[in-house]
Amino acid sequence: MAKIVECIPNFSEGQNQAVIDGLVATAKSIPGVTLLDYSSDASHNRSVFTLVGDDQSIQEAAFQLVKYASENIDMTKHHGEHPRMGATDVCPFVPIKDITTQECVEISKQVAERINRELGIPIFLYEDSATRPERQNLAKVRKGQFEGMPEKLLEEDWAPDYGDRKIHPTAGVTAVGARMPLVAFNVNLDTDNIDIAHKIAKIIRGSGGGYKYCKAIGVMLEDRHIAQVSMNMVNFEKCSLYRTFETIKFEARRYGVNVIGSEVIGLAPAKALIDVAEYYLQVEDFDYHKQILENHLLG
């Protein structure tokens, strides 16, 4: 059986359609790899791609995409609501079928080494590939963002895992690693007060005493004049989407603010969304494996 790996590179470009189209063309040009989905957000100025392929082809696709991004995205001119530190901000590998997390860790290291060797971009290994505990958390790795990275790389504890203590002048720094599937889930508020989104995000994220498997920040969607709580649900089975959604609604009420919508960025495991439906429909004795038609059709 072929080993199947998912790769979800995040690029610091969500406004220039020509560059986005170039990334799409690059992804589609690699044999053995399928581009399942991509989405771009102008306010975040960020694009998220989802690819799957065998364990060899996915490495080539990841490298070629990072290469294209490094040649076409200038971080010195980048402005957006989402935290970022590089043209390719983060490049995770996720085990999908007949492959282990440890094998994906090795894939991430091989890709990271090649990116640094051929493109001169410093690399931090993160999540399951992290070389020390504090580097497991992407937020800690990315703290300081592109503008603060030149100083950060000179700090005693923040030498890159690959490369010198000097950022790429236009492509910045990239985080590469292996991780389990996550859900990128954002909730929109009917307010233009970013402080409210910041306060709610602080309450629900694990680092603030909230949900252990939720990472959250407040961002402003300038084009819509609304604030947003932007989340990564790193383990949706232990911290469900409905739980964070309901908590955000509850906390927003103290400020006289309502939730006006939500969005899932990129692809999400079916079970993450089925759990939400099961909760709101109050389905009794539901069996995900037995009662979902597609599970039987797909074997």
UniProtKB/Swiss-Prot annotation:
Is the keyword Cytoplasm in the record?
yes
Positions annotated as active site in the UniProt record: 82 (for formimidoyltransferase activity)
Q: Which domain of life is it from?
A: Bacteria
What GO cellular component is one of the record's annotations?
A: cytoplasm
What EC number is given for this enzyme? 2.1.2.5, 6.3.3.2
Q: What GO molecular function terms would the record report?
A: 5-formyltetrahydrofolate cyclo-ligase activity; folic acid binding; glutamate formimidoyltransferase activity
Decide whether keyword Glycoprotein is in the record: no
User: What biological processes does GO assign it?
Assistant: L-histidine catabolic process to glutamate and formamide; L-histidine catabolic process to glutamate and formate; tetrahydrofolate interconversion
Q: Which residues bind folate?
A: 163-172
Where can this protein be found? Cytoplasm
SUPFAM superfamilies (UniProt xref): Formiminotransferase domain of formiminotransferase-cyclodeaminase (SSF55116)
In terms of InterPro entries, this protein maps to:
Formiminotransferase_C, Formiminotransferase_C_sf, Formiminotransferase_cat, Formiminotransferase_N, Formiminotransferase_N_sf, FormiminoTrfase_cat_dom_sf, FTCD
Query: What are the protein's UniProt keywords?
Result: Cytoplasm, Folate-binding, Histidine metabolism, Ligase, Transferase
Catalytic reaction list? (6S)-5-formyl-5,6,7,8-tetrahydrofolate + L-glutamate = N-formyl-L-glutamate + (6S)-5,6,7,8-tetrahydrofolate + H(+); 5-formimidoyltetrahydrofolate + L-glutamate = N-formimidoyl-L-glutamate + (6S)-5,6,7,8-tetrahydrofolate; (6S)-5-formyl-5,6,7,8-tetrahydrofolate + ATP = (6R)-5,10-methenyltetrahydrofolate + ADP + phosphate
Write out the similarity annotation: Belongs to the formiminotransferase family.
Q: What does this protein do?
A: Catalyzes the transfer of the formyl group from N-formylglutamate to tetrahydrofolate (THF) to yield 5-formyltetrahydrofolate (5-CHO-THF) and glutamate (Glu). The triglutamate form of 5-CHO-THF (5-CHO-THF-Glu3) can also be used as substrate. It can also catalyze the transfer of the formimino group from N-formiminoglutamate to tetrahydrofolate (THF) to yield 5-formiminotetrahydrofolate (5-NH=CH-THF) and glutamate (Glu). It can replace YgfA to catalyze the irreversible ATP-dependent transformation of 5-CHO-THF to form 5,10-methenyltetrahydrofolate (5,10-CH=THF).
Q: What is this protein called?
A: Glutamate formimidoyltransferase
Organism, by scientific name, is Streptococcus pyogenes serotype M1
